[in-house]
Amino acid sequence: NVSGATFQAQCSAGSYQPAYAQTSCFSANAGYYVASPASANQTACELGTYQPYIGQSSCLNAQPGYYVGSTGSTNQTACSVGTYQPYSGQSGCLNAAAGHYVPTTASIQQYECAVGTYQSATGQDKCESASPGYYVNSTASDRQFPCVPGTYQPAIGADSCLIADPGNYVDTQAATAQIACSEGSYKPYAGADSADDCMLADMGYYVPLTGSIAQTPCALGSYAANQGQITCDSASPGYYVNSAASVQQHPCEAGNWQDLAGQTSCN
């Protein structure tokens, strides 16, 4: 300031003076700016911008991954986990969409949930693994899907279901295990969805074990007169069975005898 001056000096950009007859200018505060020389006022940084220093002629745009949610700000704020911001100069962050997640702060993008995982909510920092009995077979899924009857899944995070093995069935949705066909029944094919799919052993045959895929013919000297037998019956004394897979025993003819059980002929 010079005494006896014949002119007035302008405040430079970044400074201002609201009063008359002053000998100096004020530097713009942090969070504010003065864009033009000879200004009487400072201006607050707008939403999406900030200024950490004094005496500035402009504000800084928030960087991607950050935001400024109030005017007159001196700093930008990192987007929290579960949110992201791909653009600069923004006043807020975007929630991760359903089927997506954001695991870190200051992220500029969201990430798709991988196969075997899903996320039904928005704004999340991780995806959920598919539960046992369920599967997720695509990326970015917002739900898990139940295994249909005839299939099952015992593990978490699966991308498909397992088909019921031969000798087994699955009769409910979202099953975590298959059920073995009971003794006396069998199933030669995969994917059974009902206990009724297990077939009873035919007469002349038997099934001794659960989870069987085939029936077994009764051996010589034995027979099965009923369906669904788990063992064959031995021919009684006085009777014989001389062929496999027999449905009945035969009496010894007149003049012949048989004292023992399970025989194939008479004496």
PLM regions and their residue ranges:
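Disulfide-rich, cysteine-dense extracellular ectodomains and adjacent flexible linkers of secreted
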Residues: N1-N267
